[in-house]
Amino acid sequence: MKKLTFLLVALAANPAFASEGPFVSLRNAHFVILVAFLIFVGVLIKFKVPSMLLGMLDKRAEGIKADLDEAKALRDEAQKILASYERKAREVQGQADEIVAAAKRDAQLAAEQAKADLKEAIARRLKGAEDRIASAEAAALKDVKDRAVQVAVAAAAEVLANQMSASDKSGMIDAAITEVETRLN
């Protein structure tokens, strides 16, 4: 520190040597400035300003170092958190892919089941329609047979009525009545 002060004084005094006239005179501005400067430096040294400045600079350096260490720790922690979130994002993406694949499989199975159900429903409806058609055919055939029987009975009745005598008719009626009585008992 003393060397630095001496160096500053020596450098500050160089321009004073270049002035004209006697240097050590209160009329020489350079001399007065040199004396004021030396007094100023002396006061600074007396009140230990350089050591205070160095202490403040050391404290500031320590604060900066602590801030840098804290920033490094925060950066490391942030990198760990980022890695954790990236890992979780990959896991979530994998789960989402699995869910989508499962949904596609379920949709495919549901579509196949719907096709099978539709085929079964169509087969049931076809069977029902075929049964109704067969029933309608049977009913129509029965109606045709009944009508044919009615027509045949009416024709036979008319033929018998025209060809039979009254005594034959009454004998047939009596025979029919006795047959009905025997069947009912």
UniProtKB/Swiss-Prot annotation:
Entry GO CC: plasma membrane; plasma membrane-derived chromatophore membrane; proton-transporting ATP synthase complex
Keyword Membrane annotated: yes
Transmembrane domains' residue ranges: 29-49
GO molecular function: proton-transporting ATP synthase activity, rotational mechanism; proton-transporting ATPase activity, rotational mechanism
Keyword flag Cell cycle: no
Topology relative to the membrane: Single-pass membrane protein
Xref: InterPro entries: ATP_synth_b/b'su_bac/chlpt, ATP_synthase_B_chain
Location in the cell: Cellular chromatophore membrane
Keywords from the named record: ATP synthesis, CF(0), Hydrogen ion transport, Ion transport, Membrane, Transmembrane, Transmembrane helix, Transport
A Pfam entry, by short name: ATP-synt_B
Propeptide residue intervals: 1-19
HAMAP family per the UniProt record, alphabetical: ATP_synth_b_bprime
NCBIfam families: PRK13455.1
Similarity remark: Belongs to the ATPase B chain family.
Described function: F(1)F(0) ATP synthase produces ATP from ADP in the presence of a proton or sodium gradient. F-type ATPases consist of two structural domains, F(1) containing the extramembraneous catalytic core and F(0) containing the membrane proton channel, linked together by a central stalk and a peripheral stalk. During catalysis, ATP synthesis in the catalytic domain of F(1) is coupled via a rotary mechanism of the central stalk subunits to proton translocation. Component of the F(0) channel, it forms part of the peripheral stalk, linking F(1) to F(0).
Subunit structure comment from the entry: F-type ATPases have 2 components, F(1) - the catalytic core - and F(0) - the membrane proton channel. F(1) has five subunits: alpha(3), beta(3), gamma(1), delta(1), epsilon(1). F(0) has four main subunits: a(1), b(1), b'(1) and c(10-14). The alpha and beta chains form an alternating ring which encloses part of the gamma chain. F(1) is attached to F(0) by a central stalk formed by the gamma and epsilon chains, while a peripheral stalk is formed by the delta, b and b' chains.
Protein name: ATP synthase subunit b
Species: Rhodobacter capsulatus (Rhodopseudomonas capsulata)
